[in-house]
Amino acid sequence: MDPCECSKSGNCNCGGSCTCTNCSCKSCKKSCCPCCPSGCTKCASGCVCKGKTCDTSCCQ
């Protein structure tokens, strides 16, 4: 099962392998968040967080 915890307060933590701040997502996936956190460039394909920070690599 997905070890993800997500809160509307904007804090996502996926099994300790990913941390998203100000994500404001309503659901979590193993890719951390189905949405683009603030500071992360939005892309048509959507965003995923890799590592502990969100940068250009968050877009797949």
UniProtKB/Swiss-Prot annotation:
Chain sites annotated for binding a divalent metal cation 5: 33, 35-36, 49
Chain positions recorded as a divalent metal cation 2 binding sites: 6, 12, 14, 25
Positions with a binding annotation for a divalent metal cation 1: 4, 6, 20, 23
Keyword Lyase: no
Swiss-Prot/TrEMBL keywords: Metal-binding, Metal-thiolate cluster
Binding-site residues, a divalent metal cation 6: 36, 40, 43, 59
Presence of the UniProt keyword Metal-binding in the record: yes
Entry-linked InterPro entries: Metalthion_dom_sf (IPR017854), Metalthion_dom_sf_vert (IPR023587), Metalthion_vert (IPR000006), Metalthion_vert_metal_BS (IPR018064)
Binding site for a divalent metal cation 4: 32-33, 43, 47
GO molecular function, one term: metal ion binding
Binding positions for a divalent metal cation 7 per the UniProt entry: 49, 54, 58-59
Domain of life (superkingdom): Eukaryota
Region (Alpha): 29-60
Binding residues annotated for a divalent metal cation 3, in chain numbering: 14, 18, 23, 28
Chain segments carrying region Beta: 1-28
Stated role: Metallothioneins have a high content of cysteine residues that bind various heavy metals.
Domain notes: Class I metallothioneins contain 2 metal-binding domains: four divalent ions are chelated within cluster A of the alpha domain and are coordinated via cysteinyl thiolate bridges to 11 cysteine ligands. Cluster B, the corresponding region within the beta domain, can ligate three divalent ions to 9 cysteines.
Family in the record: Belongs to the metallothionein superfamily. Type 1 family.
Protein known as: Metallothionein A
Phylogenetic lineage: Eukaryota, Metazoa, Chordata, Craniata, Vertebrata
